[in-house]
Regions:
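Chalcogenol-based redox active-site neighborhoods
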Residues: 1-158
């Protein structure tokens, strides 16, 4: 069973999660700002590392365009701290151990994995505007090339 997916134009659900440094981070902390929230299956795995490093390498152009990036996974705070350090990640990584926020955003549910239907994290990205509304809701994205595609959709130059 999959959680309900969010529609463009709806209010982004607020949440509070713990980041890689043990600090509480809420979506409402960024009120009045544009936020990219991306959900990924697991820190340190090949696809997730590719995607995280892609955000890292593009963070300056995204920030110049007014975007804050938040990565969300079901990893522990300790695993996120290790992942951040190993990859030099320059944006907050948030721990959602009980998958509550994944479910709020429809980023957990059934997916095809190597020809089998399994239940797990749906690699997803959301763009929240300054008013707190969903402007983009992208589900089942590919790790490789995703940030370039996202930049293009947002009109952000490299």
């Amino acid at each position: 069973m999959s959680a309900a997916k969010l529609d463009v134009g709806t209010r982004a659900p607020d949440f509070t999660l713990t980041d890689q440094d043990g600090a509480s981070v809420s979506l409402s902390d960024f009120a009045g700002s544009k936020v990219i929230i991306y959900f990924y299956p697991a820190a340190g795995t090949p696809g997730c590392t590719t995607q995280a490093c892609d955000f890292r390498d593009n963070i300056n152009s995204l920030k110049s365009a007014g975007y804050q990036v938040l990565g969300v996974s079901k990893d522990t705070v300790a695993d996120l701290k290790k992942f951040q350090g190993e990859q030099g990640l320059n944006f907050p990584l948030l721990s959602d151990l009980d998958l509550a926020v994944h479910n709020l955003y429809g980023a957990y549910g059934e997916k095809n994995l190597y020809g089998k239907t399994v239940t797990g994290v749906l690699r997803s990205t959301f763009v929240v505007d300054e008013a707190g509304d969903i402007r983009l809701a992208l589900y089942n994205v590919k790790a490789t090339g995703h940030v370039a595609s996202l930049r293009k959709k947002l009109g952000v130059d490299a």
